[in-house]
Amino acid sequence: MKSYTLNNGVSIPVLGFGTWKAENGEVAYQAVLEALKAGYRHIDTAAIYKNEESVGRAIRDSGIPRQEIFVTTKLWNTNHSYEEARQAFEQSMEKLDLDYLDLYLIHWPNPKPLRENDAWETRNAEVWRAMEDLYQEGKIRAIGVSNFLPKHLD
């Protein structure tokens, strides 16, 4: 499968299997297993999808070496501080039951609770710092953002 190389040298498959709306349990488990059997090597989930346990179990049960599967999960809107981001990451890793994560994303740039007084900008900077620390600690191979517009990155 074709892949792209990220700025830090990590290779990411261009096509990923998304698990949004895949109900935790047998539905998500079977969906991910079948996607992997069909040749997908990038699995995308998120804390808010509430299916990380099934996604992780399917990855482990697939028989495909972990290093051949690119796994992405995302930080939800309610965890936008340094400590909350680190705790949320650890919770996701516990549910996924994986040794490392390939890509961790801030799911949304401007959560409703943080819109007053542009608090989201400060909070996202804290979250980014936490993600950089997790990256430096070797727990994440790459970090990034999801659903951001150019104005959110200025």
Task: Please describe what each predicted stretch is.
Residues 20-22, 46-48, 74-78, 106-109, ...:
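Active-site beta-loop-alpha junctions enriched in small/polar residues
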Residues 13-26, 74-83, 113-122:
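Active-site mouth loops of central-metabolism enzymes
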Residues 12-16, 41-42, 68-74, 100-105, ...:
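Structural preference for beta-strand elements that scaffold enzyme active sites
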Residues 1-69, 130, 136:
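N-terminal binding-site loop/beta-alpha segment at the start of enzyme catalytic domains
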Residues 23, 85-154:
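Glycine/proline-rich, positively charged
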